[in-house]
Amino acid sequence: MISRFLTLAFFFLLYFAEAQNEFITIWQPGITTNPVQTVDAPFQANANQIWFPGIGQNYTIEWEEVGYPSNNGTMINVTSTSQVLIDFGPTREEGQGATTKYRVKVSNGNGTFQQFKSVSYQIIGTVPANMQSKGSLDKLLEIEQWGNINWTSMDAAFANCQRVLLTATDSPDLTNVTDASLMFYLATSFSGAPSMQNWDTSNIEIFKHMFDCRHASQVYISGETFNSPIGTWNMSAATDLSYMFAGRQHFNQNLNFWNVSNVTNMAWMFAACPVFNQPLNNWNTSSLENIEFMFFLNHVFNQPLNNWDTSQVIKMNNAFSFATSFNQPLDSWDVSSVTTISAMFSNASSFNQSLGSWDLSSLVNGLGPLHFSAINCQNYSATLAGWADNPNTPDNIDFGNNTPAQYAANVVNKRDFLINTKNWTISGDTQGSCILSTVEIKNNQKILIYPNPTSDFIYLNQISDAKKYQIIDFSGRLVKHGELKEKWIDVKSLTNGNYILIIKTKEKELNFKFIKD
């Protein structure tokens, strides 16, 4: 008796363990969709069939009718590079064929099941296009269990699965996954689950379009509810977060403790996220290169970002366009690598900050960054003055139409300098009634040395009380020193290389690195 009990217990535990190993999904093959979804397959599945978009070698598929588990089937040694047809046959649920659901369980079997990929697609520009369904995506209702499948990729795993829900309480094995692009792209019913906070994302590099709910036509979809707690994810390997939450109407989770130190691309990340307003000031953005359209059409975001390291950023166009609540100082941003700020604050109807401290030395496209922003006369004047007085400001910039900005009478000469000397094109602004004080103008001028690199002279800007200088080479040796009687220092006698210039004023010492060439 005891022996029989132990034997039964052993087989029960074995069955339970095997059941936990399966990737389980729920399907409704008889459901109708308008318009009819076409699968890129040899033929279209009927009301008792599905195309299962699985990829693997010699894996096993088991299925059963929900509510009638005796109606089941098994497919062994399945090998597929795109999809496999599952034929459920006639339902046991009399008269209910259209609503009959099936539980599909996939295990490694005699080989390996590797990937579930719903669509093939191309990226045209930065947007997914030419999507072709590889499975009966409109018939997939639920992810019930992840099992122990060692996934190799989550690229487009559930893209365009517009009915899919996540009810699994376990976590997928993402150890070997580096790409989660489009994982739930256009999965409009996907609301996530609390279990997502336990996912190990430490090796994933690409998160672009992961939860994006926006058609290639840039139309955003209403009615979705995704707002899962994913603030604990390990993002240390991440490089691309572009479009990650674009168009998600309810997403508002705290992501401030994400490690984004390797991320280069955040373009469109929170675009058209109408409730997202969480702090991001802890982020290490030292690798960041692209923030174009990052907060585009986000009407509530208004969090401090002034401590971001933007020294590597190249693209800032439309970053806060139509971000109608945003009004935070960005005067400490290093924009010296930025090539485009076009429409950056266009229609940002609360933005009223001076940008006069910005170093625009790499700027190529500056078209209309303040068009219909809320910048007032003082801050717009300080911006023009700061840029006019900065020797790094480039020539030949089309600043475009910045209606309805106004400038002070005493910065007309600064604006004229940009137009007549720097060959800028500026339109849409008009002279206002404010007066910019001398202190305000000076506060928008950086302490600078220029040119750098240099071959003969270093010129000093805005160091009025400088008394003495020292030049030290990179071995620590003092190579030149003297009294500062002019606004320049002759360095022609120095050999080519890297140096540190120390300027001594009444109150402090200022250190600058420069290159003699």
For the regions a language model picked out, list residue spans one by one.
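Bacterial Sec-dependent N-terminal signal peptides
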Residues: M1-F23, D240, T438, N452, ...
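Generic structural signal for short, solvent-exposed loop/turn connectors between secondary structure elements
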Residues: M1-F5, Y15, Q20, I55-G56, ...
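A generic structural signal for short, non-catalytic loop/turn and secondary-structure boundary residues
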Residues: T7-A9, E18-A19, N392, I419, ...
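Generic detector of low-complexity/intrinsically disordered segments
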Residues: L8-F10, Y15-F16, N282, N290, ...
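Sterically constrained small-residue positions within well-ordered secondary structures
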Residues: F10, A41-F43, F52, G95, ...
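Negatively charged
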Residues: Q20-I435
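C-terminal outer-membrane/trafficking sorting elements
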Residues: K442-D517
